[in-house]
Amino acid sequence: MIFVYALLALVITFVLVPVLIPTLKRMKFGQSIREEGPQSHMKKTGTPTMGGLTFLLSIVITSLVAIIFVDQANPIILLLFVTIGFGLIGFIDDYIIVVKKNNQGLTSKQKFLAQIGIAIIFFVLSNVFHLVNFSTSIHIPFTNVAIPLSFAYVIFIVFWQVGFSNAVNLTDGLDGLATGLSIIGFTMYAIMSFVLGETAIGIFCIIMLFALLGFLPYNINPAKVFMGDTGSLALGGIFATISIMLNQELSLIFIGLVFVIETLSVMLQVASFKLTGKRIFKMSPIHHHFELIGWSEWKVVTVFWAVGLISGLIGLWIGVH
């Protein structure tokens, strides 16, 4: 059945994208490009966005099929809730930007509060209503040490889900970058899940992986469609949730290392400019810095994918030992 889920997720996305692209163009759901960004990006103005709807719909449909046939499907139900929750936040943000012609979208406060709400509901469903059982301790790799947090673990969940949701969002600035890194990440978590005996989570990772594989051909350079916040916020939230449910939270630092680096580059850039008036990078997130020093977009993407693959394998090794 795993092969069936994989094929279904792949086919649904691959078929939906070319159907959605002309619809988005007709409705003028095009991406606005920052004028201060690399000039090579200006030609992308008007490229359809909100393409994340395709793979999210594929994930929802395939997961609902899996829930019928999978024993102990509660983890899939919970992951589906997070997918829809963070995806909905991203969709509203994209809608305001594209339809209402407000480049700011949701305010940072609105987005943050909505993300916190999803994280708290996830904690309540899992640890209060016991939809799934996972530890409320953070496990330190290569040791038998676990830091117990009890109900304070909800604070960690909020930090982890909100942090990685926004990290993937920041990374989604080059054609295929976030999609490719997510494919690598879900591959690692699929393997880890099956090794750890978490079959339902493994099946969900397979669904994620193949849904994104169906999207990638349309998203690599030159991209015919962008995933938008609809896709990127959902992907980051799902990554954080999977690491939590596997009790392998810190593995995500390696499996999502490029997302972490991208986020840190923005934080360092802002802090440096506020404190010294000088910028560390030519532009942040750091993928734009490499473009501005002369790297082609495709070179940046492939190098970052390679870094993601190597660090992902390290994260996988940490998770299964």
Swiss-Prot record:
Catalytic activity: UDP-N-acetyl-alpha-D-muramoyl-L-alanyl-gamma-D-glutamyl-L-lysyl-D-alanyl-D-alanine + di-trans,octa-cis-undecaprenyl phosphate = Mur2Ac(oyl-L-Ala-gamma-D-Glu-L-Lys-D-Ala-D-Ala)-di-trans,octa-cis-undecaprenyl diphosphate + UMP
InterPro entries: Glycosyl_transferase_4 (IPR000715), PNAcMuramoyl-5peptid_Trfase (IPR003524), PNAcMuramoyl-5peptid_Trfase_CS (IPR018480)
Residue ranges annotated as Extracellular topological domain: 70-75, 134-150, 198-202, 247-249, 321
Principal place of residence: membrane
Assigned EC number: 2.7.8.13
Keyword field contains Nucleus: no
One of the protein's GO biological processes: cell wall organization
HAMAP family: MraY (MF_00038)
Similarity annotation: Belongs to the glycosyltransferase 4 family. MraY subfamily.
Name of the molecule in the record: Phospho-N-acetylmuramoyl-pentapeptide-transferase
Source organism of this protein record: Staphylococcus aureus (strain NCTC 8325 / PS 47)
Taxonomy of the source species: Bacteria, Bacillati, Bacillota, Bacilli, Bacillales
